Swiss-Prot record:
Expressed by the venom gland. One of its GO terms (cellular component) is extracellular region. Residues 1-21 form the signal peptide. Pfam families: Prokineticin. Keywords: Disulfide bond, Secreted, Signal, Toxin. InterPro entries: Prokineticin_domain. GO terms for molecular function: toxin activity. This is U8-theraphotoxin-Hhn1e. Belongs to the AVIT (prokineticin) family. Disulfide bonds join 23-35, 29-44, 34-67, 54-75, 69-81. It comes from Cyriopagopus hainanus.
Length: 84
């Protein structure tokens, strides 16, 4: 019984962590993160570092595959962050 209780507790903690990362817009994410994903499942993700996948910044702040790059980096034509 204790094992079942422990498993349930761990599962609930994991679900709370997943839910806390969901977002509806950029305003839901902390600094250094953007709201990215499909229409049904968006999560706060970190801005892209050097060589990581990215999407160019846009005025609507809507991203599906990944976030824009960190400051001082730019998103190349092959959607990878590189030095500006």
């Amino acid at each position: 019984m204790k094992v079942v209780l422990l498993v349930c507790l761990v599962w609930m903690m994991a679900m709370m962590e997943l839910v806390s990362c969901e977002c509806w817009s950029q305003a839901d994410c902390s600094g250094g993160h953007c709201c990215a994903g499909s229409s049904f499942s968006k999560n706060c993700r970190p801005y892209g570092g050097d060589g990581e996948q990215c999407e160019p910044r846009n005025k609507y702040e809507v991203y599906s595959r990944g976030c824009p790059c960190e400051e001082n980096l730019m998103c190349s034509v092959i959607n990878r962050c590189q030095s500006a």
